[in-house]
């Protein structure tokens, strides 16, 4: 890998139905084995279910869920003199959103049941209401950063 220049950022197109980049990112995360049409079907059905369940705009519910699940700080391992420290650091907006989407999906996949649409619907609604595993994961990350605040002077 070349060390000369940083790679260019990928430009993410907005999806055709909701005109949102966030939706495109989530569909890409749902994607398994290149089956994008199946991922889109799962997501759009989940959005319909969210609308029926909450009687609110599903895009607003999704945005609120992602906002609630987005971490502000994280810990990163830093090796110094034979011991490894968990150093807290702020999370940039893009990485925070990506982490929130990843946590939402992994929490949805861990839920009991076979229907991914129902699992994703419930996880998004729970995250919008500040409950659920994705929110628990964010709080756990914040607790780790708080516990290791003493090492915050170690920079990268």
Swiss-Prot record:
The keyword Ribonucleoprotein applies. Its main location: plastid. It comes from the Eukaryota. Keywords: Chloroplast, Plastid, Ribonucleoprotein, Ribosomal protein, RNA-binding, rRNA-binding. Disulfide bonds: none annotated. The keyword rRNA-binding applies. It is found in: Plastid, Chloroplast. GO terms for molecular function: rRNA binding; structural constituent of ribosome. GO terms for biological process: translation. InterPro entries: Ribosomal_uS7, Ribosomal_uS7_bac/org-type, Ribosomal_uS7_CS, Ribosomal_uS7_dom, Ribosomal_uS7_dom_sf. GO terms for cellular component: chloroplast; small ribosomal subunit. Part of the 30S ribosomal subunit. One of the primary rRNA binding proteins, it binds directly to 16S rRNA where it nucleates assembly of the head domain of the 30S subunit. Belongs to the universal ribosomal protein uS7 family. This is Small ribosomal subunit protein uS7c. It comes from Mesostigma viride (Green alga). The lineage of its organism: Eukaryota, Viridiplantae, Streptophyta, Mesostigmatophyceae, Mesostigmatales. The gene is rps7.
């Amino acid at each position: 890998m070349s060390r000369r220049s940083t790679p260019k950022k990928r430009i993410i197109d907005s999806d055709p139905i909701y005109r949102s980049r966030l939706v495109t990112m989530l569909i890409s995360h749902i994607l398994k084995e290149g089956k994008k049409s199946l991922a889109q079907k799962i997501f759009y059905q989940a959005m319909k279910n969210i609308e029926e369940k909450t009687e609110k705009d599903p895009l607003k519910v999704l945005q609120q869920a992602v906002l609630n699940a987005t971490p502000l700080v994280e810990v990163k391992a830093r090796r110094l003199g034979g011991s490894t420290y968990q150093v807290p650091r702020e999370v940039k907006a893009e990485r925070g959103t990506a982490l929130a989407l990843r946590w939402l999906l992994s929490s949805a996949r861990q839920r009991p049941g076979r229907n991914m649409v129902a699992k994703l619907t419930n996880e998004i609604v729970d995250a919008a209401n500040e409950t659920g595993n994705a929110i628990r994961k964010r709080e756990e990350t914040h607790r780790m950063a708080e516990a290791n605040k003493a090492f915050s002077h170690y920079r990268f």
